[in-house]
Amino acid sequence: MQKFVYEYATKVNFGAGAVKEHLAQAVSGYGQNVMLAYGGGSVIDCCKIVAAQAKTEEDLWEMEMTEHKFPTEVLPMGAIVTASGTGAEMNGGAVITNEEKVIKAGMAAAAPRFAILDPEYTLSVPRMQVISGAFDTLSHAMETYFGNSDQDNVSDDVALSIMRNTVVNMRRLLKDINDVQARGNLMWDSAMAENGILKVGRVTDFQAHQMEHQLGAYTDCNHGQGLAVIHPAYYRHIVKDAEEKFQRFGKEVFGVDSAQAGVEALADFIKECGLPTKMGELKSKVEITPEILRNVADTCNVIKCNPRELSRDEIYDLLMECM
């Protein structure tokens, strides 16, 4: 298992020449009764979509995005995780890029019946992708925690523990990328952040994810790295709207006293990890220009349950602050 070759993939494509055509080749002619995803989040998401599309003659994208209907039957599937961070093995959601429409969005698909998480399977994943994936985990926990819910929610306590543990183990990997125990802890952090437990009894704020999804649709940038660029700017815009929660975040995750200090501690941690902090540092298929960021702001989903709903102009402004 340790000898497989890591191949980077940023997205799962939907549209002409992508998932639908591969599905026809992979499923229709062979009569499979189960699927096994072996890889990271993109591989697992692709199999989730294939497992859902295999059981309907309708176009899955149109069915969900236009008709707002969801699959009622899916092909059974399982997952062997070789690159952690997304938590894709723990739920029925899948993030899909439709290149024809320039939309990157979440869809309801198949949920794995089982998942195998062995940190030794991740040892050939390169340092930057491990850290980028772990930041996605941290983002999942943060975006759940900062949703506009009541204080003293038990799910918040669990989220803060996952954030703190993720930071601790990312720092361990910065010292020793082959620390199997740290990789194992991060695999479990990833699973816990997206298995639904943190979302019990609360609403969530995934505005940073919505911005990054559309940024990825236009640029093909790495998901975790795009989040690393966006999060500090976004939190500087909303910190005063959830000051008590940011203060607790700063104290319990980074050991600082004030809400603003918590945001800046997060920004410093991103630099410590060697993650990108500006749009120009992202690996992109095109130059990231103000025009692209305007398109991102105009087309991303706007979340109404974050501490304060943002206007599209404010989203554009904060994205420009990342240039």
Where are these regions (language model features)?
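N-terminal amphipathic/basic leader segments beginning at the initiator methionine
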Residues: 1-30, 308
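Short glycine/serine/threonine-rich phosphate/pyrophosphate-binding segments
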Residues: 19-22, 42-47, 87-90, 208, ...
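N-terminal small/polar loop signature for handling phosphorylated ligands or for N-terminal nucleophile
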Residues: 28, 32, 38-59, 71, ...
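A glycine/threonine-rich phosphate-anchoring loop and its flanking beta-alpha core
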Residues: 55-154
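Short alpha-helical scaffolding segments that buttress acidic/His motifs in well-ordered protein cores
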Residues: 138-142, 183-194, 231, 266, ...
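Active-site segments that bind and position negatively charged phosphate/pyrophosphate groups
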Residues: 144, 148-265
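C-terminal charged capping/lid subdomain of soluble metabolic enzymes
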Residues: 246, 256-323
